[in-house]
């Protein structure tokens, strides 16, 4: 087995027990240096440098800094001598002062007027008492597969949404991937954000109609398993998200032959985009890395690595898709970012969905669709006009000022996207979305999965006034709790609305 070295554009995460050790390099730095240079040097040791403008001043002060001090173990500095303590505190205070000085005040945020709800979709049915963690639509057999955290099982529904099959997993199914005649299922031991070896990859035979069989066990929060063939040999890519100990693995004929140790691998695609007969593996990575990686298979078994996109740690990548989004015959990369799990903060203007031109060397951004807190999206032709549209759900939406962004339809007209709330956007805290011809009438419908998984105040979240200013309104949470988590089915009515 080969353990890959880190791509040059990435830096390995530091596995250090406390802030004093993490900042120990400060003591060996000769002379004084500017606060900006100090911040760039030290913050870039673990991840890409986050510019001060990436968050408002109050978010740095009340959100990011308490979180980082807890993460780095600032309390442990008391175990060191007075000189070390003074030096480390002075440098840390200098870094914080730089960010507070260079970041902007939070402007007032008036509540936005909600745009008209999309007439292209209407509520068809609801499947109650489901903590939805994954959705897969089997178009050939008219079945919908749902990963349910509540029952820790894969539930299968027919077109009338009758539960026709249940695969007990005793784990939380989080991803489905159909490859040839197998429906692969990635499962976690729980939704708790902890490193664990309770994860599993298995598959359901006969394209999801047969029996469940485990394939790989003892995994650290697996998020995607993609099998493929190359030069007559069976390969597979496994993404283990983990928390601090995740990894990306390549299997050949069932044996692990290559490992890249990095946490946060969240999605994967295998394509031959340049039609040279050599497959390329694209992996989206979140956590502190926030990047898009490409592994190119070479004749003779070699693998070339490259970093196509690298963002700062507050970016929050959540999902990806690769297809020809604008009909120009070339594959585009669609990426969403909106995860703010680590600490609560105000909306970030760079959250949303971006379309990148894969044909350019620098992966140029072609379009940006703003959507705060976006967690998942699906691409579909909602109006049957030949233009590919996008539907998205935002788990971390701005529920105080723009609650309609929780579930949106982004309609493409003349190359631009117009945003419309989906019917029932306020009915749940949507975590997953999928599209497909659910009712068999020839046009794509939508499936929305709710998962109200509340995060309560953590030890480092101590400023009650700040927390009140960014928390989800109690009335919104009360509505979610009253309705319960569920699967919502939206029927395509675009033909009727014309």
Describe these PLM feature segments:
Residues 23-33:
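Bacterial Sec-dependent signal peptides at the C-terminal "C-region" and cleavage site
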Residues 5-8, 24, 272:
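Residue-level detector of bioactive/disordered segments in secreted/extracellular proteins
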């Amino acid at each position: 087995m080969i353990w890959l070295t880190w791509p040059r554009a990435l830096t390995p995460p530091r596995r250090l027990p406390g802030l004093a050790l993490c900042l120990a390099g400060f003591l060996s730095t000769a002379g004084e240096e500017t606060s900006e240079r100090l911040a760039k040097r030290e913050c870039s040791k673990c991840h890409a440098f986050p510019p001060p403008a990436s968050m408002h001043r109050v978010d740095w002060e009340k959100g990011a800094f308490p979180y980082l001090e807890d993460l780095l173990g600032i309390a442990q500095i008391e175990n060191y001598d007075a000189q070390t303590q003074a030096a480390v505190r002075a440098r840390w205070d200098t870094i914080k002062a730089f960010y507070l000085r260079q970041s902007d005040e939070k402007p007032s945020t008036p509540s936005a007027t909600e745009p008209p709800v999309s007439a292209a979709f209407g509520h068809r049915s609801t499947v109650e008492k489901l903590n939805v963690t994954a959705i897969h639509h089997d178009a050939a057999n008219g079945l919908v597969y749902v990963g349910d955290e509540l029952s820790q099982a894969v539930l299968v529904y027919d077109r009338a949404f009758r539960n026709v099959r249940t695969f007990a997993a005793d784990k939380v199914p989080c991803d489905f991937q159909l490859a040839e005649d197998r429906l692969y299922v990635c499962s976690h031991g729980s939704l708790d954000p902890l490193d664990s070896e309770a994860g599993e990859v298995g598959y359901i035979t006969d394209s999801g109609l047969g029996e469940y069989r485990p394939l790989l066990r003892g995994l650290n929060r697996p998020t995607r398993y993609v099998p493929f063939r190359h030069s007559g040999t069976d390969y597979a890519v496994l993404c283990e998200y983990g928390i601090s100990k995740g990894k990306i693995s390549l299997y050949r004929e069932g044996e692990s032959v290559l490992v890249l140790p990095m946490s946060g691998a969240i999605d994967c695609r295998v394509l031959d985009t340049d039609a040279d007969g050599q497959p390329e593996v694209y992996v989206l990575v979140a956590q502190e890395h926030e990047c898009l990686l490409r592994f190119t298979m070479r004749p003779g078994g070699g693998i070339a690595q490259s970093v196509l996109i690298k963002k700062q740690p507050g970016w929050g990548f959540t999902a990806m898709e690769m297809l020809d989004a604008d009909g120009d015959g070339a594959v585009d990369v669609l990426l969403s970012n909106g995860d703010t799990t680590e600490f609560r903060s105000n909306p970030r203007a760079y959250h949303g969905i971006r379309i990148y031109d894969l044909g350019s060397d620098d992966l140029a951004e072609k379009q940006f669709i703003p959507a705060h807190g976006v967690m998942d999206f699906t691409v579909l032709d909602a109006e049957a006009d030949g233009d590919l549209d996008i539907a998205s759900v935002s788990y971390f939406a701005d529920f105080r000022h723009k609650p309609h962004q929780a579930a949106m339809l982004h309609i493409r007209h003349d190359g631009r996207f117009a945003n419309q709330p989906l019917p029932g956007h306020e009915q749940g805290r949507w975590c997953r979305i999928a599209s497909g011809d659910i009712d068999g009438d020839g046009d794509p419908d939508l499936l929305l999965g709710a998962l109200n998984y509340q995060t309560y105040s953590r030890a480092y979240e101590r400023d009650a006034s700040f927390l009140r200013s960014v928390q989800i309104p109690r009335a919104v949470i009360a509505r979610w709790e009253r309705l319960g988590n569920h699967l919502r089915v939206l029927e395509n009515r675009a033909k009727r609305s014309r």
